[in-house]
Every structure is written in C-alpha cells, then in structure tokens.
C-alpha cells in the first residue's frame, strides 16, 4: 500500500525525496552536532576565562565577543534538547525504517538537527578572536589608604576647631611650611563643618590668586552661571547671595592678603555668624591681613611621630625583611626632618625595597641630592630629587615632568594627560588602545608614589606645590611655565631655542602680536586666559616643530589666524570652550593632526575642513556643531578614527548614525537634543557601547533600552562599563532609567524636568531582566541630582551603600516617600546634602539617625540655578529657557539675586511657580494674582520662574 501510494502520488515524491535526505544522515548528523557543540562550549568557556582575567586588569570585552557568546547561549539549549530526544527518535526510525509511514514529526526533527548543526558550525567558525578586549576606562578612584592623623595632628585639629567655633573669631589663618599638612587640616575642618551642619560650606583652591578664578569657584557653589560678566558684576552677585547666608569659606593656599570686597565676600562678624579659614605658607599673610582674628601654626612632626608615620608608609613586611633595615630606615626618615609630605613620598618609594643594598644606595642618593641644593635649609627638594632619580623608567619620568606644566593644586584631567602623552610620542606603544592603557597605568603609578594626588571624583589628578617646584627645577632648562593675573603680556625669554615646552595659564593677556623664534618648541599649553581675544599669525611663524597646541578655555577667543596651517607637525589641537566661529581653511593642511577637540564651541558654524584631516583618531564635537548627513559623510572618510564626541539633533541623523557600526562604536560622548525618537519613543543604546557621557535634552524618549542578553552569564562584563556621566533634562515621557544597572562605573547622574519619571530603577523591570540579582547600582556614584520630577516615587527599592557619594540634591519631587538610605549609607563620606524641606517632611526615613544625617541641609542654605549650563550664551530664538529656578526666596517684595538673563526669553513649564521680574541688577519676587502665562507673554518683560 505504501508503494502504491508513493507511485500514485507523484506530487508528493519530491517532498519525500527531499525529506529522506535528513533521515539517511540523521545518526551521522547527531554525532556531528554533539561534537561541534562540545567544541563550541569549550571555545565559549575559554573566552569567558580570558574575559574574566582581562577584566581584573581593567579591560573590557569587545561587543562582537559578547554578541558571539550571547548567540552561543541562545543555540545551546536548542542543541541540547535535540540531543536529549535523539534516542527516542533513532528508535522510532529503526521501527519504521525509511518508509512513508514515518511520522511527520521525525522528518521535522531530522531537519532541525541538520539546520542546528549548520548553525553551530557557523558559530564555531566565527568564534576565533585575535583580541577579546579593549581598554575600559580606569577605576574612578585609585584606592589609597585614608589619611590617619598623628596624635599631635589630632590635637591641632581640635585646637583649630575650637578657635573657629569661638564666637569672637570670624577669620582663622592656618600657616606653615609647604608639605607640613595644611591642606589636610583644612579638609578635616571641612568634613567636620559638613557633619555639624554649619550651613553653606565653600572650599576653594586659590591657585594663582586670580580674583576671578576664586569668584568662579564660589559662583559655581552658589549655582551662579557666568560667561562674560565683569569682575565687579560677579562680586555684586556673590555679595547679594552671601550676605543673606550663614557660610564658611575655606581658601587653600593664599600667598598674600586677599581683598574680600573685590571678590564679593562679606566680612564675617558675630552678627552674621559667618567664618573664613585660609591656609598659607607665609606668616606675613596672616599678620598683614586686617581681617584675621586668630592664627594656628602647623609645625613638623616630632622625631618619634615622624618615625611612626614612616613605618606605617613603608610597611612591616619591608621593615622585617632584614635585621639591618630598621636602622637604615631611621637614617632615611631622619633626612625628612619631620615633614609629612617627604615622609610619605620617600616611605612609599621604599615600601618595596627589601635588601640592605637598596637602602644603603638610597642613603647615598639622598646625600648626593643634598649636595645639589646647598642653599636649601629644609632638605625637602633633595628628597624629592632622589625619588625622581630613583625612577627606573624614563617614560615615567617624562610623564611626571609633563604634569608640572599645569598650575599647582589644580585639577588635570587624566584623559587629557594621556592624550597629550600619546600625541607627544612619549608613550611607547604604537597601537592607540595599548598606549591609552599604558598612560593610565603610569598615572596610577604616580598616584601610588604620591607624586600626584587624585581629585575631581577620581577623573583628575593634581600635583602638590612642592612636588611641582622640584619638577620645574629639573625641567627648568627646557620648560617655561607662567601664570596668574599679574601677567598682562607675553614674557621675554633669553634664548627661545632652548625651550621645548611652554605653559601660559590664567593670565590677563588680551592680544598676542609677538613672534618668538622658538623652532624647538613642541608643546604650547595656552589655557584659561579669560581675556585673550586675538592671536597674530606671526606668533606661530617660527613654531615649525609644534606638536601640541592647547588653546582651551580662552572664552573670548573667536578666531585662529590662517598661519596656523604652517604647523605641519601638529598632532594635537584643542579649541574647546572658546567662542571660535569658524576654522581656518588652512587647517586642512595639517595632515599630521590626530586629535581635534572642539567640545563646547557653541558659536562654531561649520567644520568642512574635517574631511581633509584623514589621520584624525580623536574628534570631539560635544555641545558644538550639530551632526548632519553631510558631516556624517565627512567623518566616514576618517578611517583611523577611534574616538568620537557628537551633538545630534534630528531623528534621521540619529538613525543613520546608529546604523553605521564603525562610527557608533567609537562614540564616547553624545549630546542628544530636541530629537524625536522613532520606534515608539524607544532609544536603543546597543550600538554605542563605548559611551562615557550621555546628555539628553528635550527629547520625546519613552524608554532607554539596551541588550540585556549579555548579562545572563555572571562572567560577562557589564555592557556600559565606561559610562561615567548621565544628564537628562526635559524628557517629557521618560518613566525610568533601569538600564543604569548595566553602568557600574556611573559617577554623576542628573535628572531634571521629567514629568512622567516614576522610578529611577524599576524593581519590576530589574527582576524581569536580571532575576533576583545581588548586584547593587551606584557603587561609584559621586553626584546625584533629582529635580523637578513630580511623579517620582522611588530611586531604588532597598537602601544602598553609596560608598563614594559626595553631593546629593533632591528638589521638587512631591511624591518621593522613601529614599535608598539607611544609617550605613555613605559611611565614611562627608556628603553635601541639599534636600528640599517639603521632601524632608514627607519622606519615610529608615530611622531617626538616617533622617538627621541626610536632612540637615535644606533649601534655605542654598541657591541653585536650574538652567542647563550647556545652554549658557545661546540665544532665546534657538533655545528658549524652560525654567530658571531660584531656591530660598519667598514672599512678596523680597530682593533676590540670580544669573543675568538680559534678553533671554523665559517661558513657563510648570504649574506652581513664583514670578521674578528683572529690575536693574536685582529681582523682585512676588506672587501674581493673574495667570502666570499671561504675565510671561507680556511684551518687553523678562521673568525668572521660581518654584515654591
């Protein structure tokens, strides 16, 4: 019957013949499937081990490797299921033979075996990777032991605190020689002030004593935002705010008496309860200041305390490694003469020296170095010089000296340093990623040696003044480093031919017409000269060997001369934070250029020359020219591009950008503004996995999504390992940010004006994606700002440790009933906490201790302008300001201070607001009886909106 059926049904014959080929080879295919699955699993496990090992040294898995592992995890259960069913299917096949009575399910099974085997084989062929990782950004903070005070230092802290709290003391001066611990004491005082809820605490590193720099730091703390205001205007605005506040101003490192009135700081008095504390190396700075009420001197440690500190730094294991080492160690410690800085530096340098020969050699080097400084009384520079001489790696020495180009005790971006070193050719690695790894490792080494100090939430480093003094002494023959507001014109150098590197920072120079004959100059750092407007072409005429040119933060600089095209060896050009309007056409001649930074150049209109810079590896346009399809085509010509920062406006551009894998995978910073997100308002970040900073403004995003598949295996590195900063402003439909669970290194999160935001991390979504995971978010978060989120109910569903949190702001979140804090949160940290009084009243605290800890600092002590700082200077036509908030001013007729918004259009975006009318240089606050919108629309009137 079966034979008759097959003969009499010719239309089915091809079907049966086609299917039987699966049956004939079923057993062979099953054996092959079993073998290739074993091979595939072995390859997958090897990759996981390699990834895990590389993760330990700070590297990150390549996206293509993650996707391959994810596909293996998808196909593995299908193959295993087929193999589990193989016995019953083979038995069924044996029972029926290869006849037409075989069930259709067996045919389907045989077909699945073959197609699955082919899929597994394809995966196996694609599973060979020469590299499985690329560089992840370094840890936010290099773990260093906390500073422990000696007995005398602890007593000194108590003394300083008692004097500061004396009602008759308004200003306290702390003085002592460099390296003795003045900054440490000032930091300890700051921490005690924060714990004791004194009020507004402002910490300023004075640097070059530039009045406007001090004003800017104070203004930043007060929420004031300036661009081109005069020094006098800034002083008036600072004074208007501070005279209504109880504040403590901490000034670290002044060298002469400061004019408080010029800065805008009111004098402390018994009536206002304000305090000022400053540190200085000069007793005269204390004695000459008519406003100093008390002084505290810091002296060097006693011999026994110095020995205790030295032992602690060197470590017991080293001291016990040979019986003669403790005696030799006392000789080394004695050369430091009780100076904590020197003890820490030389102690760290000797912590790995475990032979008598090494210790004796160090004593010899110290003696030799002392002979180089016969006029030095304290012996500090000889110690520092001996540490430098003891560096075994010449590359580390060069990198260390490079750091001296920047002002003392001021932040230097780690990323900036690494980029300088790469472009200078200091780093030995030819591959850029390997060079970046080497650069960050060198920074880590210098921090561990205590020659650099971490700052800026771990993203920056700075150099102690005495360490920098030694570095400049070593490099003095080839370095020129100047700065400060006393400098009004370019300096004269006896022999420009000797100069290799020059730094001119924070001066009053306005125009440059000089033509220095400096053909050997390779590095010119000309930053933060706030009044610089014009540079002549002759200035660059003789700089034929220039490799690095940094003109960043010269905010008045509007153009570059065409003569810059003669810098044919230039590899690094930084024009960020300038008001430059266009790039010289001659820039296209700079064929050696590999790094071009145009971040925050909001006046820049076009960048057509980019298409000619074919060797570019780094291109930065964050908060600059918006990407369009023409610019995208130009960027695609840059085949060597490794890093890209962009501003994107428009859905078509965004879609096209994310579809080009080479460009998308190189994006480090993305500013997405006023863009309609297609696909139902869902923004997928899968393609931009190297993202470091994401800034979203005014987009219709409903949800931000990522590919969660790569997180099922615990061994896989989180997908967004690099992202450090996230800013979201005015995204009307966004409800949560659960994807941040995959951003373990997130350092700063700011979310404002998102009316539909209900949760920061959604418990339901997290459980659905990750299951009952024990991973806790925000382990590296230093700054959290939540403002204007009327529906926000939850940040996270359980208390979190927040181990490095430093700054917390929660305002205008009326539905927020619980905060993810308990008495163990932020333990060991001093957190500047600004929580609106209304929020404090409605929050259900874990316990009274938690409430006291996080609720002591409210809006009466703080002024915060909520205008997006990235919009500063933009015209109302291009970006109407949605809200500007002034906290702490209520009631009819009060005078308030705020940012100058002359000529800017302000529109209402909320429902409960107070209107502030501009009147000369003050603002009158009142509650209107008529609808706010009617008043906002009044022609010729400027308003501030103040939420109450």
From Swiss-Prot:
Where do the annotations place ATP binding? 176-183
What does the entry give for GO biological process? defense response to other organism
Q: What's a single GO MF annotation on this record?
A: ATP hydrolysis activity
Which regions are annotated as LRR repeats?
A: 498-519, 520-542, 545-567, 569-591, 592-614, 615-636, 640-661, 666-686, 690-711
InterPro entries registered for this protein in UniProt: AAA+_ATPase (IPR003593), Apaf_helical (IPR042197), G_AIG1 (IPR006703), LRR_dom_sf (IPR032675), LRR_R13L4/SHOC2-like (IPR055414), NB-ARC (IPR002182), P-loop_NTPase (IPR027417), Plant_NBS-LRR (IPR050905)
The UniProt entry's coiled-coil ranges are: 20-57
Domain NB-ARC: start-end pairs: 134-432
Q: Which SMART domains match?
A: AAA
Q: Which UniProt keywords apply?
A: ATP-binding, Coiled coil, Leucine-rich repeat, Nucleotide-binding, Plant defense, Repeat
Describe the task this protein carries out: Potential disease resistance protein.
Which family is it part of? Belongs to the disease resistance NB-LRR family.
What is written about domains in the entry's comments? Answer: The LRR repeats probably act as specificity determinant of pathogen recognition.
Q: Which PANTHER family match?
A: NB-ARC DOMAIN-CONTAINING PROTEIN, NB-ARC DOMAIN-CONTAINING PROTEIN-RELATED
Q: Could you identify this protein by its name?
A: Probable disease resistance protein At5g47260
